[in-house]
Amino acid sequence: PVVEEKKQSNQKKETQPSPQSEKSDEEYDVAVLGSGPGGYTAAFRAADLGLKVVLIERYTTIGGVCLNVGCIPSKALLHTAKVITDAEDTASHGVSFSQPKIDLDQLRNWKSNKVVKKLTMGLAQMAKQREVKVIEGEGKFASPNQINVKLNDGAKKTIGFKSAIIAAG
């Protein structure tokens, strides 16, 4: 179904249960499976349109592979390599530096706790501001309007929805 843009309102509309085979633990207008760039963008936009949204992610932080272990961490390390190369290149300008000492543990800590963590915490805050419910667990469709989620703590939850977006990479 096509989501039509509604007038901005601070009130979320009431969500009615959708047709399903068993009772859901929670009901949403939109369920998004996967919290990478496509998933969180879709979830945030749906929430901005006034829909009640749940974002289901198997890992403990939103942002997907790109943000957590792929593109962003790799680019952070590449940036450090470029800084070293740029410093070496200044010798032609008459400025030279001693050979850098690389502390891999500190470099990894910077990448994980300064770069990646800052971005994932920003996304979590944006989800909270938009009242997007984030559920940590693995979701599988149980019916056309339900997803069974095995939560990361081992519990199970059934999510009812009107529309779903699969953004699992």
State the predicted function of each range.
Residues 1-3, 35:
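Mobile cofactor-carrier "swinging-arm" domains
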Residues 4-22, 26-28, 44-51, 57-169:
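Glycine-rich flavin
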Residues 34-37, 60:
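Glycine-rich Rossmann-fold phosphate-binding loop(s) that bind the pyrophosphate
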